[in-house]
């Protein structure tokens, strides 16, 4: 079966135009009405600041302050994990030349930085759970031109391999979450390889995880055809993982997780929905715009370095 050329049936253009006109005519609420009734459209205040939607002691994002008149004043950004400014973590990482993403996972989950024994044990747990369940490649075989879409399906697919998928005890949810943290890079790389094969018409490569690698090293070694990467590349990716680990509990994808989990649904459904939110161009999709901007700078700016 040629997945790349299979298409979803579409209505003819005239029919769709008529239906859309009918829909728009009867499904519109003007912004003035929302403002008059105090509805926070997009969970934003009129000045663009976020709406308080919950409390968390896991992460805090500081990007502005307000003066006495309530005007928003931009300030140098701060990202604080469990009371620790990530700049301190970054300084520590470069001072001692080590990878810190695994430490940050522990910090976010358990509230404090791990000691060496805890870190070693945790890294071993992650390494043991990088591999996907036996038979899971059947799920991977249906490709997608969008890797985020494929990740959603992969996460939902793991439900079928979990005998306790609906168990909402703390022990089971934590176990599922750690397994997802460990296996997500593997699913991501495999989704990319399937996209290369079916949509980019290039060769795909599947490499087994190597013992003793950090998450950043694991991604690079399984992503590259020759499994080669520099230490500098791995450290840079480690930093990227660090700064994207959490953004305060109020961002779109985290808020989505909280909405779904509040209904009592399973872990896989909640995380898959969060990935769908992260896929949106107004949230995680902004990274693609940054990448395009960097490429444009390299192409059109003389001496960009």
Where are these regions (language model features)?
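Hydrophobic alpha-helical bundle cores within soluble ligand-binding/oligomerization subdomains
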Residues: 2-305
């Amino acid at each position: 079966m040629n997945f790349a050329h299979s298409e979803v049936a579409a209505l003819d253009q005239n029919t769709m135009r008529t239906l859309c006109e009918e829909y728009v005519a009867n499904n519109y609420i003007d912004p003035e009405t929302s403002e008059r009734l105090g509805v926070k459209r997009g969970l934003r205040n009129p000045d663009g600041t976020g709406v308080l939607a919950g409390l968390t002691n896991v992460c805090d994002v500081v990007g502005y302050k307000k003066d006495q008149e309530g005007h928003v004043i931009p300030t140098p950004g701060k990202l604080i994990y469990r009371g620790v400014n990530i700049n301190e973590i970054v300084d520590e990482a470069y001072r001692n030349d080590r990878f810190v993403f695994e430490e940050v996972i522990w910090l976010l989950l358990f509230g404090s930085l791990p000691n060496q024994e805890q870190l070693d044990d945790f890294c071993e747990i992650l390494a043991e759970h990088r591999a996907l369940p036996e038979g899971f490649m059947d799920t991977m075989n249906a490709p997608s031109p969008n890797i985020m879409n494929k990740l959603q399906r992969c996460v939902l697919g793991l439900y079928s391999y979990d005998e306790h998928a609906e168990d909402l005890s703390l022990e089971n949810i934590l176990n599922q979450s750690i397994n997802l943290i460990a296996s997500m890079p593997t699913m991501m790389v495999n989704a990319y390889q399937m996209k290369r094969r079916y949509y980019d018409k290039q060769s795909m490569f599947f490499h087994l995880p190597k013992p003793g690698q950090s998450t950043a090293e694991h991604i690079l070694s399984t992503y590259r055809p020759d499994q080669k990467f520099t230490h500098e590349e791995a450290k840079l990716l480690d930093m990227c993982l660090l700064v994207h680990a959490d953004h305060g509990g109020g961002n779109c994808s985290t808020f989505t997780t909280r909405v779904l989990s509040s209904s009592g649904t399973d872990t896989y459904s909640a995380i898959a929905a969060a990935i769908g939110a992260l896929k949106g161009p107004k949230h995680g999709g902004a990274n693609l715009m940054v990448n395009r901007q960097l490429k444009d700078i390299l192409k059109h700016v003389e001496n960009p370095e």
